[in-house]
């Protein structure tokens, strides 16, 4: 069962964990992975989960099950983190140099999945914010080693130029007659 937003939802900064959270009513809190240094100033105080946030979240709930084969709980977790990343994280400068250039031109939009190639590893990424030449993506794979000293884990965000986004390949089945 997918969790639908209601009037009791609001964003909070969890002082104990030093992370953004969302209160889902009087007895439930969802802790995002986003720490203080990544957040916009408004995210450090209680903030309404407004209509725009709800529309984005619901769009993610509708889109993600069509492209990801994960549990309902995983869909909700991904949608909540994507909503937090879209509205409450500071903007970033592109860090495209970590990723290989794609040979194909892609159409990029929020909610679309792409592959990022980093050396020998390939990671799944969800577009959470899109600009004219670059997109902020949220990593959906468990881990991505960018360099000897830098790595990304699931739900981390990074901004990359559109030419680094590789389209997902669909498995093709050849049937011989």
From Swiss-Prot:
Keyword Cytoplasm (UniProt): yes
InterPro entries the UniProt entry points to: ZapC, ZapC_C, ZapC_N
Subcellular location field: Cytoplasm
GO annotation, biological process: division septum assembly; FtsZ-dependent cytokinesis
Subcellular location, principal: cytoplasm
Gene Ontology CC annotations of this record: cytoplasm
One family name in Pfam for this protein: ZapC_N
Keywords of the record: Cell cycle, Cell division, Cytoplasm, Septation
UniProt entry tagged with the keyword Membrane: no
Quaternary state and interactors: Interacts directly with FtsZ.
Function: Contributes to the efficiency of the cell division process by stabilizing the polymeric form of the cell division protein FtsZ. Acts by promoting interactions between FtsZ protofilaments and suppressing the GTPase activity of FtsZ.
Family: Belongs to the ZapC family.
Name of the protein in question: Cell division protein ZapC
Gene that produces this protein: zapC
